[in-house]
Amino acid sequence: MVPVSFCFFFLLLLLSAGESSSQLVSGPHITDVNILLPPKMKNPVEYRLQGSDGCFKWSWDHHDILSVTPEFNSSSHCSTSARLRSISPYSGRKETAVYATDIQTGMVIRCKVFIDNFSRIQIFHNSIKLDLDGLSMLRVRAFDNEDNEFSSLVGLQFIWKLMPESGGSTHHLAHVPLKESPLTDCGGLCGYLDIQKKLEDSGVFADLFVVKGTKIGHEKVSVHLLEAPLTHIADEIVLTVAEAMSLEPRSPVYVLMGASFGYTLKVMRGNVPQAVDLPSPHHRWSVLNSSVAQVDSLIGLTKALSLGVTTVVVEDTRVAGHIQGSSINVVTPDTLILYISPWSMSGDLITESKPFPSSMHWYVVSGRQYLIQMKIFSGRPDAHEIYITETDDIKLYGKDSDYWKIVSLPDELSSEYGQRNSRILNAISPGLGELTSTLTYFSGHQESKEVLKVVQEIRVCEKVQFTLNSEDDTPKVLLPWTPAVYQEMELIVTGGCAKASSDYKWFTSDISILSVSAYGIIQAKRPGIATVKVVSTFDSQNFDEVIVEVSIPSSMVMLQNFPVETVVGSHLKAAVTMKALNGATFSRCDAFNSLIKWKTGSESFVIVNATSEMMMLDELRSMDSSPPCSRASIYTASTGRTVLQATLAKEFHYFDKSLSESIDLKATLTIGAYLPLSVRQDSDGNHHGGYWFDKAQEETDFGVSKLYLVPGTYVDVMLLGGPERWDDNVEFTETVKTLYEDEEDLTSRVNVHHEVDRRANMYRISCQKLGSYKLVFLRGNLLGIDHPVPAVAEALLSVHCSLPSSVVLIVDEPVNKLDVIRAASQADRAPGRLRVTPVTVANGQIIRVAAVGISEFGEAFSNSSTLSLRWELTSCNNLAYWDDDYNSKMTKSGWERFLALRNESGLCTVRATVSGIDYSFKSQYSTLLPQGSESTLTDAVRLQLVSTLRVTPEFNLVFFNPNAKVNLSMTGGSCLWEAVVNNSRVAEVIRPPSGLQCSQMMLSPKGLGTTIVTVYDIGVSPPLSALALIKVADVDWIKIASGDEISIMEGSTHSIDLLTGIDDGMTFDSSQYSLMDIMVHIEDDLVEHVTVDEDSLSVGEHVATSSFKIAARRLGITTLYVSARQQSGGKVLSQTIKVEVYSPPRLHPQGIFLVPGASYVLTIEGGPTMNVSVDYTTVDNEVAKIEKSGRLYATSPGNTTIYATIYGSEGAVICQAIGNAEVGLPATAMLVAQSDTVAVGHEMPVSPSFPEGDLLSFYELCSAYKWTIEDEKVLIFIASSINVEENAGFVNVVQGRSAGKTRVTIAFSCDFVSPGLYSESRTYEASMILSVVPDLPLSLGAPMTWVLPPFYTSSGLLPSSSEPQKHRDGQSHRGNIVYSILKDCSSRADFERDTISINGGSVKTTDSNNVACIQAKDRTSGRIEIAACVRVAEVAQIRMKSEGIPFHVIDLAVGGELELPINYYDTLGIPFLEAHGVTTYNVETNHRDVVFIKTVNDQPSAYIKGIKHGKALIRVSIGDNLRKSDYVLVSVGAHIFPQNPVIHTGNLLNFSITGADNEVTGQWFTSNRSVISVNVASGQAKAISQGSTHVTFKGHGLKLQTKVTVLFGNTIYVDSPGETLTNVHVPAEGYKFPVKFRENKFAVTEHGNKATFNCQVDPPFIGYTKPWMDLDTGNTYCLFFPYSPEHLVHSMSITKDMKPHVSFSVDASLKEARRVSGSASALLIGGFSVTGPDKLNINPDSNTTIISLVGNTDVQIHCRNKGRLSISLIKRDDFGIAGHAQYKVNVLRSEQFTDRIIITLPATGQIVEIDVCYDTGESLVASSKDGYSVLLKILWGVLVLVVSVIILMKVIDRQVPTGATGTATYSGNAAQGTPERRSGTVIYHEESPRTPSPFMEYVKRTVDETPYYRREGRRRFNPQNTM
């Protein structure tokens, strides 16, 4: 153990030592610690002493000889440098010191300053030789007599002179002014150039002098001081000017032995290198070692003689000693390497490409040129390139090849690249070949030579090229992009000798714009232009590039490749493409396929497979169309036209905050559908020997393809369906074509006449001659605008002109139907065409008898009127006769007659025979009818006259129940009948009672199924029969037919209709409902089921009819469903409907006063809310106008009535609310305050008002508020919200200063303007007198006095123990602290009356104006103190005040939420400690469309939420007393987030814009970059140094600003707890967020104790926090208490995008310095709660129940035995952490059991178990036995517990004295004397307020001022363990 401890201690020492050393290194610094300055002179000398890493305060010793001027940075808060200047004349050498004190760390740095006179000066320079046209900087330095250099000469005046050395007049140097020189002083940080330039401008010189070389030679430079009496001090130097020389080739030069080459000499003239022509008269050449090389002295020609190193020197003879040299190395070669580089067609080397050596594979591109260089190297491993001369033997082979050609360099480039060692390769075609190069050289002796050889393989490849789909192959790709949509496109590339996709490398110039995969698939990332580059892996120079532009789609158009109309029942194809802003079409855009939404304006056109029509893509490509972005197939269900619309809508700011745009593209196309073109017969042949058709039936149900006409007749036909005329821009065609076989003119045989005058689609077809013809009708639209494909339909019609081959008679039919004609023509006939089977008809009526012509094919003629008929009756004398009168009235044709039947039975024969041609056609068609045709053109039928039997109803649906009965009625026939059922297992016939045998028949159901009841009338011959269908079924469904949502006014009733039926849709008769056991099930008692006869309560009563009534009892929304019992015992349930009970609607406000030009948003309180709409109207629009949103605009003075009408979903009026509005001009104004008095030091808001209204009525129209106070010694304005520009000065706050009365006055002007209707301006002035009540002369108890309302019981304000809660003894219910009320014992009445009393930890009050003090006694120590005093007062004032709302103005972002705390004050403006539920308050605003207000019962806060941009005034008042009101102006709009942050140095903070309508773009700025820096584009800020500054955002029409405070270091640290945070099963002490402090001036008080701090949670709606300190450990925490799920459901603003978890932060800040703060973030996972009992008791009468959950509904629910219970979700409102769900529990088995339902939340592990008990009532004995056993177990457990408690109490009593002995002493330095605490039990209320800070200050001050009070062993603590 000891070694471990020693190691640990040693480690701590090392760490502390490391920290100390790091602090020494990182402290503040200054630039100099010793400074030498001259004394005061005519021109003062200044020196800047620069500091760093600190903020300094400057001081110095001798203020008479030295002046120190601090310099501050741009924020003027910190000094980092100071200017030093001597201020005393010279009187000997002096010494002083300057001290730089870092105000942050307190570190002091001392700088010694010496002041002495000059002894000498000296010119300092870097070189005495300078180049021609070059610059040189000369500087004067001064020294004292000890040769110490002076620190600065800036400010002194000097005289500089230039003089040729030889004494001539030609100067070799020229002076360059400082302002024209390139010198800088770094902005004053590295020099004093500004002062030196000013000296030169004034005509003298400074200590700095710049010269320029102008001519080769020597120049004298002299300087002397221009300061009396030191003008004799001077200095002089000589400078040399020469030309700068350079040699080529550059030194060092490596050559082979025997090489010969010449140098090129260049000189700098005018800063431009120029070659010198050799030989030159001014230059001579020489070599240092002539055995290695020799050089020509005039022209510089050099030859290498032997291996070695030497130097060639060239000298300028004009300047002595001016030479330039070049090193020559004569070497032997080691390697020969070939290099290849791309060569441009213009003859230039592509410099950005790197040459490839022969050690690599060479790949070249066909069609390109390359530079091949042969290079020789020597000296491994540090190889040096050898300079190749003309004498070197180097060769290149392989010049001629099928794949390339090699040529020499042009002459003008040979000098640059080398004629001998460079070639140009022209690649011709792909292939593989070789190049060979050799070098022959001397190996060291002139006699022997050696050869170097290199062979290089070259492959010629095709150029890498993109293959684009565009027609011109323009190397540009255009891709669309929107957030979260990344369009992809595969790029096709060829060339590069590639064999696989891996032989290419892909690059993109900007990966943030475009990404590219290894397979060439590009993906758009954001808008912009990027270049995609594909490179061959073999040759990096073989590449291709394509420009890819990514842009946001600007428009969307339909592709014009498909028909726009088609036949009903088929499909239309459509496709869209998108275009960029410039109109260019995107190369590919199919990634938007799923985002583009298709819809039509009609339900007749159905979108099918809008995103998967891939076949259409191939069709579009084959059409050479633009690439489609989305495709759709539209099914045409019915005719008509509609607009097909494709939309692409997307918001940007949800994905990227930097984007402010949104995309909303639409493309429309008119499409249509038409019925198939058909021909319909329009003229009726019913009266003319033809068939009948129903003109009234649907046009699509009847068409004709064949017509049979007798010559001379006609028929009208109509074209049905087909395309309608599209529009005027599209040609419409409608024609008829005739097809025939022979060449005869058709017009003589059949005539088609278009009936234009009647209807455009009507044709008359007349038959002229015999024959068969075919007509083709064409109708449709051709090509045109918006009609790209023709749509022409056709219909065929065959016309047969012939004579009938037979005729048939139609008997007792109102018309000649085709089916009747067909049946009659196919009937059996006897000779003479007499129909064998008689036709039975009922007697006693007039029947119609008609004849129809039949063709040889058995088809009925359409018209046979050319032929005439003869009618005959046989054996009908007593039975029937022709009714000529009736016949003449009903018809004029001979092809139909009317026969009157007598009331007799028997047989009668009717015959019709064609007798010839009608007289009107005889002249033209007399020869049509052949001779002898009468024998075939005849028909006869026998009529059987009888009475008819009928059974009604013919169908009956019967509920399967033994008690059900079916009654059938019979009419006609005789009374002798027999009934037979074909399935006796379904139903049986019951004989009716006596007297009803002839008219009724009864059936009873026996089983499920269908049966036919046949009734035979045996009284007629032959017997007649009638049929009825009976279906016996069980009920399959029951439905509420009154709708799924019903709204009922409170107190009224509503009737609900029912339907029952079976699966095929048939319904039961209401008479059978009583057999179905129909029950009504209502969720709760909001509504009740009442009987039809009376409004008595009958919940759960059976319904025996098809409707029932419900009565509305309470407000709210509930659900209702009905059930019916099947014969099998099962139940069928109807749909669940919502029933809303609403209160009578009321217009809010019901009466309102406004001034002209003002507006107010009215709302409806009460009324229905489900599927309703509200329409607002005013009676007089000249007085006020109102919008649909309810916004009322006052226009001109007057009165009007406002109606708010509520409509249902079908447009029916449900209810109406009425209000009134008065518009007027107030004559006077008044000033309003909530009280006439205010206490000294307290505040009260005041505002103007009118007698007829308040601020809500006029504040928007008034401005120029001017507030004055008559006597500012009595009152002052402390926090004015006046802002003239924003017209927000209507509220001010006054504070009492001293006793007295004074007048407060306001003046303002109002512009009552209603555009175009009313305009007037007025000025108002109002005042009031306020009294200021002074404090009492002695009121030390005022700060510790709690103000409470009368007759009030507070929360647990009085803690009963001083111990932390976790240390309290859980077994003791007695606290350590005892409280009592101090009373006046002299008055017995006052003593006995408890005006203020204590109840547990609460304080109870009675009457007002009572004061009492509470005494606290610690029973363990015996200490007695005054805990607090209580004053009882009436609530007189109300405020919306908090630290976040100091000036009655709030800035709120759109969607942002804020809690407005509501506080109460007495008549003097003193706040109440508590006043929960004492009075009611009302919160109102004039613009509810701008802000949403929500108040929660029993919570002293109002919650507001920004809805849209604008301003709204919020008023809070006590009840309806408008004088007791406070106002807050809310401005909803865009804001910088976060607002007014406080961060610490070195930290980062991301600013953003919230609450904007659209995503905004702009730039960020900071007003002080030394405090904080901010990224201009992103808004990311970094804290640099301590201070305050402003961050500004500037966008399009938007400028926002916020203040930023930067603190030095983190002073408060807040950590998050490690456990999972949820709002269910919260620890009793809450969740602990540890708070740690850094020991600095912000966090430590003068006595060393931790300062108090505040805690706050954001967002506030999820819970609350309070600070807490553990007195044992000294640790501090923010305790977080989340609200329960029930609280969140009722208090939160519900939105659909809420999640089951909420991210929140806990902030801690110092009370003394709120800027010093810290925060920690955490995640709260919502839990759930089950509303209702924890045990479900179910019985057979109600075998279902509902389980309701609130909170997080992402739960798993199951039971142990799934065979007994079924659990199903019936409703779920998924609102995240505040959701709501309902589950239905059904019992599946009718047997007694118990089970358990388990509900689990996987996110938190929360489990809730619910016991289920199903009791059938069958067994009571067993349950009683079980109950006895359980009771015995409980009694036994209680007995054991009681005995254990008794034993434990005795043990505790014995231990108490021991612990109490140590409670009397306190020792500050001995831990052994610390007493053992006795714990008491304290229950803290969750909303217990803190002890007021004034009271705590009073306690501290009392302790500090108490004489002889020992503080050593005491520590201050809060009795409530709170800060």
Curated annotation (Swiss-Prot):
Glycans are attached at N73, N117, N289, N609, N863, N903, N967, N982, N1171, N1199, N1550, N1568, N1743. The chain crosses the membrane at residues 1829-1849. Keywords: Glycoprotein, Membrane, mRNA transport, Nuclear pore complex, Nucleus, Protein transport, Signal, Translocation, Transmembrane, Transmembrane helix, Transport. Residues 1-22 form the signal peptide. It is a single-pass membrane protein. It comes from the Eukaryota. Residues 1152-1205 form the BIG2 domain. One of its GO terms (cellular component) is nuclear membrane. PANTHER family: NUCLEAR PORE MEMBRANE GLYCOPROTEIN 210, NUCLEAR PORE MEMBRANE GLYCOPROTEIN GP210-RELATED. Belongs to the NUP210 family. Part of the nuclear pore complex (NPC). The NPC has an eight-fold symmetrical structure comprising a central transport channel and two rings, the cytoplasmic and nuclear rings, to which eight filaments are attached. The cytoplasmic filaments have loose ends, while the nuclear filaments are joined in a distal ring, forming a nuclear basket. NPCs are highly dynamic in configuration and composition, and can be devided in 3 subcomplexes, the NUP62 subcomplex, the NUP107-160 subcomplex and the NUP93 subcomplex, containing approximately 30 different nucleoporin proteins. This is Nuclear pore complex protein GP210.
